[in-house]
Structure formats: structure tokens, C-alpha cells
């Protein structure tokens, strides 16, 4: 297989195989299994059940199966490879599609005007290698992404699940000199679950005074569930999941509202919402927060880490002016 295999999805998601990638040891004398932290140089070092290795030099895929022939062990085996489901341009409506088993982005795009995605199902997205760094490769894959500027970007009534990175996102990193405007962004009435980040957004501060900002952004009526519970937990950086993820970026914004959503459990962070200026933070209203005891949140300007406890509601009201919020605290085993 020439294109990188992202993951094995077995029996339509009952199980997944773990994609082994190699990282350099601290002294660079050998390479290690990214998860087990033991010496790994080739397929011959596979020994854990349902670990697999895709050999980049010849394209051969090796799967370790302790229970015999995988074709007899499993009723179905899907192997997403490194490609997008769709790559969108300006003035596109994607309506009533099922997009599954895609190794890169389900729907990807650069700077785009008028992209509407509605009534779609996207699942088992991402996990292939994006690039090879100095010490280890980086995997990637979002359900729906615009990287760059946008106008009239609408995602409505979609079911998005099991994405290696974010379910839905608009983003631009902190490089370059160009102005970037993200405006009229609406994520509404979606169910997003078992992704590392249900919704991810960030706007990096550009060089040489370029103008980068978001305006007229609305997240409403969404059910966001179980960030950090899906196959994206294969990632080595396991301490990043959150239901809404802004990272610690510049994130200049105006008229940014998060209204009437359900936030249902996430670990280790419930939310990660921050900006360089407190006036750029979104306003929250009438959201329901189902919170795992013992987790935390990264919030505010400047960003700080807060414990999820009985004071969480007061904290959200103070930082984001939330009115009408509901806060429900559960143990991890309380809710299936």
C-alpha cells in the first residue's frame, strides 16, 4: 500500500489496531515504540496484540494478531489511508453524505468563502502521518477543517465521531504576514463525540502586524461528548483533549458566542478556551456542562488551569459571563 495506513478499524469499530510509529531515544542511539517506550526498529519487533507497522520503504503492512488470521478473527477490516474525503473550494454545499474511513481530513480546505456542510456523517477520520519531524512523525486528521480565512462557514446537523484530532475546526497558525479574517462561522445542531477535540479553533498572531481575527462566530445547539475517549488516544500527547480547544493562541475575536450546547465529559480538560485579551473571549449562555470530577480546565486571559469542582459554575460566569448554565458533576463510571 503506497499511501500511509492510518488505523485498522475492526468489526465496524468494536476494536482498533494501534499504529506503531518510531521515535528516537533520548541519546538518538536507537528508535523506540511510541507507546511502549521499548526498542523498535522493524516489523520483527511487533509483539503486542493488534499493533501494526506500515513499512514506508516498501508499503507492506504488518499486523500482530495473537488469535490467528485476522480475516477469520474479524468480520470486517477497514484500513483508512492518507487522503481526504473531500477537498472544498468556494461556494460549495456538501449535503447528506456519509464520509468514513479516511486517513487525512474528512473535508479539508484552505482559505474558503461559503462552505456549507449539513446532514452529513463523518467517522473514523485521520491518523495517517502528516510529516516526519526530527525525533518522531506527527499524525493528523480532522473531520471538517478550514485552514485559513473563511466567510459563511456553516456546519449544521452533522454527526461527527472518531476523529484522530478535531471533529470540526477553523484555524491558522502563528506564521506569515498575510491578513486572515474568519467571519460568519456557525456550528449548529451537531453531535460530535469520541474525538480528541470536538471543536477546535485558533488564530495565531501573524508577523509584522498583519491583521488576523474572528468575527460573528456562533456555536449553538451542539452535543459535544467524550473528548479524549476515541482512537485519537493513540497519540503520544495524551494531555491535550478538551471539548472546545483554542490552545494558548492570540485568538482575537468579536461577537463570538457559545449558546445552548451540551458539554458531556472530557478528560483531562473539560474546556480549553483562552485569548491574549479578555475582551476577545467568547460569551457563553445556557449551556449544560456534564463534568468529570478530578479533571481540569484551561481558561481565560491570561490562561490559567482550574480544577473542576463545585466552584466551576461561578468560574464560568466570571470569565465568560454565562447566564443560564447548568452544571452536573459525575464520576467517570456514572454515565455510559
Predicted region positions:
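Acidic, glycine- and Ser/Thr-rich low-complexity intrinsically disordered tracts
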Residues: 1-49, 53-55, 251-259, 266, ...
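Feature targets compositionally biased, intrinsically disordered low-complexity regions
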Residues: 12, 58, 67, 84, ...
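Residue-identity detector for threonine
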Residues: 16, 30-31, 41, 57, ...
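Extracellular beta-strand/beta-solenoid scaffold signature
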Residues: 2-5, 49, 78-85, 101-108, ...
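Right-handed parallel beta-helix
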Residues: 90-101, 113-133, 140-143, 150-171, ...
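Secondary-structure junction/capping motif
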Residues: 69, 207, 214, 238-248, ...
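Extracellular polysaccharide-degrading/modifying enzymes targeting complex plant/algal/animal polysaccharides
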Residues: 1-101, 108, 128-139
Amino acid at each position: 500500500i503506497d499511501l500511509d495506513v492510518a488505523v485498522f478499524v475492526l468489526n465496524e469499530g468494536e476494536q482498533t489496531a494501534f499504529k506503531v510509529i518510531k521515535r528516537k531515544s533520548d541519546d538518538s542511539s536507537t528508535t523506540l515504540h511510541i507507546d511502549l517506550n521499548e526498542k523498535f526498529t522493524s516489523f520483527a519487533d511487533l509483539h503486542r496484540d493488534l499493533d501494526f507497522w506500515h513499512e514506508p520503504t516498501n508499503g507492506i503492512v504488518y499486523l500482530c494478531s495473537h488469535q490467528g488470521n485476522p480475516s477469520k478473527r474479524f468480520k470486517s477490516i477497514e484500513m483508512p489511508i492518507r487522503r481526504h474525503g473531500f477537498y472544498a473550494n468556494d461556494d460549495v454545499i456538501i449535503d447528506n453524505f456519509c464520509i468514513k474511513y479516511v486517513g487525512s481530513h474528512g473535508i479539508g480546505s484552505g482559505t474558503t468563502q461559503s462552505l456549507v456542510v449539513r446532514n452529513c456523517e463523518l467517522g473514523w477520520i485521520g491518523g495517517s502521518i502528516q510529516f516526519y519531524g526530527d525525533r518522531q512523525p506527527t499524525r493528523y486528521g480532522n473531520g471538517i477543517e478550514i485552514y485559513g480565512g473563511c466567510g459563511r462557514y456553516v456546519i449544521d446537523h452533522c454527526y461527527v465521531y472518531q476523529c484522530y484530532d478535531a471533529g470540526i475546526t477553523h484555524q491558522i497558525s502563528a506564521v506569515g504576514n498575510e491578513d486572515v479574517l474568519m467571519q460568519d462561522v456557525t456550528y449548529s445542531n451537531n453531535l460530535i463525540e469520541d474525538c480528541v477535540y470536538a471543536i477546535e479553533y485558533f488564530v495565531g498572531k501573524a508577523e509584522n502586524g498583519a491583521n488576523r481575527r474572528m468575527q460573528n462566530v456562533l456555536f449553538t445547539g451542539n452535543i459535544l461528548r467524550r473528548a479524549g475517549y476515541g482512537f485519537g488516544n493513540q497519540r503520544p500527547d495524551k494531555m491535550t483533549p478538551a471539548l472546545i480547544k483554542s490552545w494558548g493562541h492570540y485568538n482575537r475575536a468579536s461577537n463570538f458566542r457559545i449558546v445552548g450546547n451540551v458539554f458531556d465529559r472530557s478528560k483531562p480538560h473539560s474546556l480549553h478556551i483562552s485569548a491574549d485579551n479578555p475582551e476577545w473571549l467568547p460569551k457563553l449562555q445556557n449551556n449544560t456542562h456534564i463534568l468529570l470530577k478530578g479533571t481540569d480546565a484551561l481558561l481565560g486571559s491570561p490562561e490559567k488551569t482550574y480544577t473542576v469542582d463545585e466552584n466551576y459554575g461561578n468560574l464560568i460566569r466570571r470569565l465568560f459571563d454565562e447566564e443560564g448554565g447548568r452544571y452536573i458533576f459525575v464520576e467517570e463510571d456514572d454515565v455510559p
